[in-house]
């Protein structure tokens, strides 16, 4: 959030043909971060991750579309920005792995869990984008 890249990130997902169905701008509490990243709790970098993520607000988004989790991960690039290709979000906007600017769910199951931590079902907006028929068969 602090880097002023939210609009550029949204633009990339919209240009790909994905549909934004929910978004929130909010603080990332330590409690929430520990729950969100519970699978990493035993890793040596975990305390630093929580401290960094808790240092400012976050923008949580929910995107829908064909293979959005898989394709979204490709668009993000590798977790380590040094391994990310130019043209990916991390390849273009990140330098150090400990200062990653974006998170993407690694599976549909993880996405469902992570979405439920931030959004109520009624906060997900169901609509048909005017670009839908140009993107999908």
Curated annotation (Swiss-Prot):
GO biological process assignments: CTP biosynthetic process; GTP biosynthetic process; regulation of apoptotic process; UTP biosynthetic process
UniProt keyword list: ATP-binding, Kinase, Magnesium, Metal-binding, Nucleotide metabolism, Nucleotide-binding, Transferase
PANTHER family: NUCLEOSIDE DIPHOSPHATE KINASE (PTHR11349)
Keyword Metal-binding tagged: yes
Entry's family note: Belongs to the NDK family.
Stated name of the protein: Putative nucleoside diphosphate kinase
Cofactor(s) in the UniProt record: Mg(2+)
Gene3D superfamilies (alphabetical): Nucleoside diphosphate kinase-like domain
Any single GO CC term annotated in Swiss-Prot or TrEMBL for this entry: extracellular exosome
Catalytic residue positions: 103
Enzyme Commission number: 2.7.4.6
Presence of keyword Oxidoreductase: no
SUPFAM superfamilies reported in the protein's UniProt record: Nucleoside diphosphate kinase, NDK
Catalytic activity, reaction form: a 2'-deoxyribonucleoside 5'-diphosphate + ATP = a 2'-deoxyribonucleoside 5'-triphosphate + ADP; a ribonucleoside 5'-diphosphate + ATP = a ribonucleoside 5'-triphosphate + ADP
Positions that bind ATP: 45, 73, 79, 90, 100
Lineage: superkingdom: Eukaryota
Pfam families: NDK
GO molecular function: ATP binding; metal ion binding; nucleoside diphosphate kinase activity
Functional description taken from the UniProt entry: Major role in the synthesis of nucleoside triphosphates other than ATP. The ATP gamma phosphate is transferred to the NDP beta phosphate via a ping-pong mechanism, using a phosphorylated active-site intermediate.
């Amino acid at each position: 959030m602090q880097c002023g890249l939210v609009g550029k990130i949204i633009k990339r997902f919209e240009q790909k043909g994905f549909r934004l169905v929910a978004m929130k701008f909010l603080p990332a509490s330590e409690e929430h971060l520990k729950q969100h990243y519970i699978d990493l709790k035993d890793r040596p970098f975990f305390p630093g991750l929580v401290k960094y993520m808790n240092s400012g607000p976050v923008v949580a988004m929910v995107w829908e579309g064909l293979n959005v989790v898989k394709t979204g991960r490709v668009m993000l690039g590798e977790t380590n920005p040094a391994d990310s290709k130019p043209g990916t979000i991390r390849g273009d906007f990140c330098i150090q792995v400990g200062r990653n600017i974006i998170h993407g769910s690694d599976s549909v199951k993880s996405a469902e869990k992570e979405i439920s931590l931030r959004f109520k079902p009624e906060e997900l907006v169901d609509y048909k984008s005017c670009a839908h028929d140009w993107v999908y068969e």
